[in-house]
Amino acid sequence: MYDSTPTIVVQDSVLADDLCQYIITFTKDAGPKPNLIASNGKNIRDEMRTSNGIGMDFGEDAVIDTIYKSMSEMCHLPISHAEPISIQRYRPGEEYKPHWDAFVHNEDLPKTIRLEECGNRAVTIIGCLNDSDAATVFPHLGLGIQSMQGRVIMFGNLDEDKEPHPLSMHMGTTPREGEKWIFTLWFREKPFMKTEKTLSKKKSEKKSTERHFDPDKHAANVMKKAKEMMKERGAMPI
């Protein structure tokens, strides 16, 4: 979780094609909205991230819940440490400017961040839902990772002192043609959601919208890819 050099893992063919399409269709039907940030007691459009998207809590859709589970297992952090998943659509001209995902402790943060209670964003996971000429770029590392359907990008955000790692700065470039679709999950150092027991109960009470693939088969595929990844490259440092 804490490292002198950011651990960046890229693994292809993790997300099934029909799962990616399900998430895109689900988000289109929900109606992507501009990203907002709190400023002086008001919500204003985020000029850093000009894409449109939606956020979803665990338990709102059984299919998307499989993403929480599989990504949790991949980064070795409990589902309860995850923030709500963010699903974003980027069109030409839309981008996410260079930024750090981790919070700075002396910043004037909204109370909803709950930094002291829940800790910082230790791990970020980006799932690529379609092929695009856009990329996730780490400027200080000279690294660009193109968006390819099924690809998962996972990286640590904190250094050995549990502070935002300078080299973890990254950006989402704009597509020259078409759209870029991704989801992002941030995992905190400590639980951010309700207890696992409550989450499991909530999940069991929810019914998914119509699905076009087998989520159990998808979960098995993700775990197979995760084991291959960890055998070849090692797990995220804990």
Model regions: which residues?
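Fe(II)/2-oxoglutarate oxygenase catalytic core
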Residues: 1-238
